[in-house]
Curated annotation (Swiss-Prot):
The gene is ERG25. One of its GO terms (biological process) is ergosterol biosynthetic process. It comes from Candida albicans (strain SC5314 / ATCC MYA-2876) (Yeast). It comes from the Eukaryota. A motif (Histidine box-3) lies at residues 257-263. Its main location: endoplasmic reticulum. The lineage of its organism: Eukaryota, Fungi, Dikarya, Ascomycota, Saccharomycotina. GO terms for molecular function: C-4 methylsterol oxidase activity; iron ion binding. Disruption phenotype: Essential gene; conditional lethal mutations decrease the production of ergosterol and accumulate 4,4-dimethylzymosterol. Its cofactor is Fe cation. This is C-4 methylsterol oxidase. InterPro entries: Fatty_acid_hydroxylase, Sterol_Desaturase_Related.
Length: 308
């Protein structure tokens, strides 16, 4: 029996269950749990093997939500009506490009990313990441997701910027820049070393958080990974809509920020936010270049006036 049953002191009212539906009916008797907690508890109880349950959960979560988020963008690429919002409207990914990208991403998922997933549950037990029910308070999870976004963005900025130097770009990061006009599926089209390095920011930051605070739930990590997947896919979508998030949150990076990075190959190294590129003057594109040139010109003029 799965150790999730240890959360409760009395299972005398539970009937013998052989199907997931029957297990859920048992958990449905517990009034102190919401529907998501009941589903979560039922899943672990039914699987009866926490290591396998966590590994399968994370693998399926990654596959379902990554490709599920890519699919709408692939459909939009085939509908001419949306071209007016396509940032590089003359560069629509062909079926061949989509297929080649899909094969590479699937290979990476099964041969690079799938293997370490099965070690995550023992790590959870080792450092104290909870997977029991009930879940933490929503306010706690919101704070943690916000912190993870900020810290991951910092990790991504510096390591992504580092991958644009010399041999790191030539032998590792160049693969990701095969598509000068990105599309959703290309979000995880990358060299295995890059997948591991940048992925470490997504997974490693929650681990460090738990080591420091001792307060983290596996459900929080699961939702964080989904949010990060959505952010990455949307940033590579190649579309800028009037309702895009950065039009309401100016510091959010969004597709236009990352599209310019792919178009011009340098600058725009952040993942979720714009502040690192703004502070360190590494924004991409002609507008940013002109801004830097104007700034240099102004500084020269000030210096000349000072020396008169």
């Amino acid at each position: 029996m799965s150790s999730i049953s240890n959360v409760y002191h009395d299972y005398s009212s539970f009937s013998n269950a052989t199907t997931f539906s029957q297990v859920y009916q048992n958990f449905n008797q517990l009034d102190n749990l919401n529907v998501f907690e009941k589903l979560w508890g039922s899943y672990y109880y039914y699987m009866a093997n926490d290591l396998f349950a966590t590994g399968l959960l994370f693998f399926l979560t990654h596959e379902i939500f990554y490709f599920g988020r890519c699919l709408p963008w692939a459909i939009i690429d085939r509908i001419p009506y949306f071209r007016k919002w396509k940032i590089q409207d003359e560069k629509i990914p062909s079926d061949k490009e989509q297929w080649e990208c899909l094969k590479s991403v699937l290979t990476s998922h099964f041969l690079v990313e799938a293997f370490p997933i099965w070690f995550f549950h023992p790590l959870c037990q080792k450092i104290g990441i909870s997977y029991q029910v009930p879940f933490p308070k929503i306010t706690d999870m919101l704070i943690q997701w916000a912190v993870f976004f900020v810290l991951e963005d910092t990790w991504h900025y510096w390591f992504h910027r580092g991958l644009h130097y010399g041999v790191f770009y030539k032998y590792i990061h160049k693969q990701h820049h095969r598509y000068a006009a990105p599309f959703g599926l290309a979000a995880e089209y990358a060299h295995p070393v890059e997948v591991a390095l940048l992925g470490l920011g997504t997974v490693g930051i929650p681990i460090v958080w738990c080591l420091i605070t001792g307060n983290l739930h596996l459900f929080t990590v699961s939702i964080w990974i989904i949010l990060r997947l959505f952010q990455a896919v949307d940033a590579h979508s190649g579309y800028e809509f009037p309702w895009s998030l950065h039009n309401f949150l100016p510091f959010w990076a969004g597709a236009d920020h990352h599209d310019e990075h792919h178009h011009y190959f340098i600058g725009g190294y952040s993942s979720s936010f714009r502040w690192w590129d703004f502070i360190l003057d590494t924004e991409a594109g002609p507008k940013a270049k002109k801004g830097r040139e104007d700034k240099v010109k102004q500084n020269v003029e000030k210096l000349q006036k000072k020396n008169l």
